[in-house]
């Protein structure tokens, strides 16, 4: 199964993301802090994609990204954050993220971006974004 880690400290946003990714066929592991995310990745080495918020208590998403990249160059990383300044985007990509999505976001777009990372990671099966886009065509604020 396609396993994803979602790091988001706000429970309502995390729940929204998790519900939509599970509907799309993903096995989702949740974390609400940077430290917890790193622990979950160590316990689940088969995670192929990580969605990381930036603004977190303790270790921020940029540092989580750096630490992941120090030990795992193959995992796909998407920064998923409200920070939309160009410098934040550049920093995210320079620390090792493969993509950067700002809130509000479309769940259909997020699923398509996750699918793209799975395709690049080795041709694994992706979610049926065409079938679910009508259901997921809502924007989250």
Regions found by a protein language model. Give the residues of each.
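Short, Lys/Arg-enriched segments at the junction into DNA-binding effector domains
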Residues: 2-3, 118-141
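N-terminal/domain-start alpha-helical segments
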Residues: 1-123
């Amino acid at each position: 199964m396609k396993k994803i880690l979602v790091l988001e400290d706000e429970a309502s946003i995390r729940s929204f993301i998790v519900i939509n990714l599970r509907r799309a066929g993903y096995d989702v592991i949740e974390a609400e802090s940077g430290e917890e995310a790193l622990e979950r990745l160590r316990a689940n080495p088969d995670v192929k994609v990580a969605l990381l918020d930036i603004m977190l208590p303790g270790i921020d998403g940029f540092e989580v990204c750096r630490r992941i990249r120090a030990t795992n160059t193959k995992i796909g990383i998407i920064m998923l954050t409200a920070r939309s300044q160009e410098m934040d985007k550049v920093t995210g990509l320079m620390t090792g993220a493969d993509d950067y999505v700002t809130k509000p976001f479309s769940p259909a777009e997020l699923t398509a971006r996750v699918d793209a990372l799975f395709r690049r990671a080795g041709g694994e099966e992706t979610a049926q974004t065409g079938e679910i886009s009508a259901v997921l065509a809502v924007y989250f604020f």
